[in-house]
């Protein structure tokens, strides 16, 4: 059986907070990796996909990119899912957040590693809505430039009519996801990851 190694790196949305933590564990269904792996078992049953969850609650885009660089120096990955930016928005400009994320994207591209760049999930605070929109627009624009870089619209999948986090996907604080929220983005990722692996002939 073929194998592939997928690095999932980011903040609490990658970790699975509040009901799951990659170190302390908890409810595995409160992580997008659970639902993504379940979906890939149907589309690619002949591949054993190993997911490395490097989500750290509270981490910023700069911290995520620093950890990404370290991770890629020691391990070879077939695919990276790099998600971040939520924790920056209260203290960092949208331009700087995007610059930090693009640094991480470029790190993957230079190593010729397939990359999925999700949008920042919705935040249920009006002041944050335009910030999320601005950064996400930049992420989508970046991904459109390259064949081996893929956009995953987490925000579009999770938001309501106000561009807030939809109630059924909300764990209760307007930022973190419920099990249904993690299921939503995990299922969303299945065809995107499937496409990325196809380009690598996996």
Residue ranges and their predicted role:
Residues 83-89, 104-135:
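Active-site segments of SGNH/GDSL-like serine hydrolases
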Residues 124-202:
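Catalytic His-Asp segment of secreted/periplasmic serine-dependent ester chemistry enzymes
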């Amino acid at each position: 059986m073929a194998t592939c190694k997928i690095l999932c790196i980011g903040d609490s949305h990658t970790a699975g907070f509040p009901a799951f933590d990659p170190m302390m564990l908890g409810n595995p269904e409160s992580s997008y990796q659970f639902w993504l792996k379940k979906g890939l078992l149907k589309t690619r049953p002949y591949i054993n996909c190993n997911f490395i969850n490097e989500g750290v609650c509270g981490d910023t885009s700069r911290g995520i990119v620093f950890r990404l660089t370290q991770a890629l120096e020691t391990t070879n990955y077939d695919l990276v899912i790099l998600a971040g930016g939520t924790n920056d928005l209260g203290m960092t400009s949208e331009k700087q957040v995007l610059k930090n994320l693009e640094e991480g994207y470029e790190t993957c591209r230079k190593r010729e590693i397939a990359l999925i760049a999700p949008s920042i999930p919705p935040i249920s605070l009006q002041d944050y809505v335009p910030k999320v929109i601005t950064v996400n627009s930049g992420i989508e624009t970046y991904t459109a430039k390259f064949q081996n870089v893929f956009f995953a619209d987490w925000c579009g999948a999770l938001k309501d009519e106000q561009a807030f986090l939809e109630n059924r996907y909300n764990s209760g604080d307007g930022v973190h996801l419920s099990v249904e929220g993690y299921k939503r983005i995990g299922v969303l990722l299945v065809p995107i990851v499937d496409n990325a692996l196809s380009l690598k002939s996996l």
